[in-house]
Amino acid sequence: MEQKAEILNSGEKYLVGARITIDAPAAKIFSFIANPHNHAKIDGSKMVKGRMVGPQKLKLGSKFYMRMRKGLPYIMKNMVVEFRENELLGWKPLAQNTWRYELKQLSDGSTEVTQWMDGRKAPKILMKREITWADKAIAKTLVNLKRIIEAKP
């Protein structure tokens, strides 16, 4: 059966996201996404190219660099600006938008995972193109995350 993430309507032009439920505890999912070396494995935009420079586990204030490609290759510097263990992880690249994961542990042991691209405080000229594709890329990322997490013992 094909998995799909729900694309969310935030009601705000520069805030796009998606949500999925993963059959795993929040701590397991958070451990995976808090390691930026895993981001290329789940990236739904196909822009993250791995070979990341940075820590094995992110925390508030962590800086990490991702090799990216959108037409031409480039390196994106990021800084963690939001962090609550097993609940929230958000980072900002140079464009000043925030990429954010929110995890909510459910009573049945599964976890609701929401990812946002929040460009409300970023220069709008940089966000105009981003909002045209980010929600679909986020939905694909969440489906990839679910597949990997649920396959791991």
Locate each region found by the language model.
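Secondary-structure transition/hinge residues
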Residues: 37, 41, 121, 146-153
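Beta-strand/loop substructures that line and gate deep hydrophobic ligand-binding cavities in soluble
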Residues: 92-140, 145-147
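Hydrophobic ligand-binding cavity/cleft-lining segments
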Residues: 1-54
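Short acidic, gly/pro-rich beta-turn/loop elements at beta-sheet edges
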Residues: 28-30, 60, 74-76, 101, ...
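Hydrophobic/aromatic beta-strand elements that line small-molecule binding cavities or substrate pockets
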Residues: 18-20, 76-82, 98-105
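Short loop segments at secondary-structure junctions
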Residues: 23-26, 83-86, 106-108
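Glycine-rich portal/gate segments that line the openings of hydrophobic small-molecule binding cavities
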Residues: 50-96, 112, 140-153
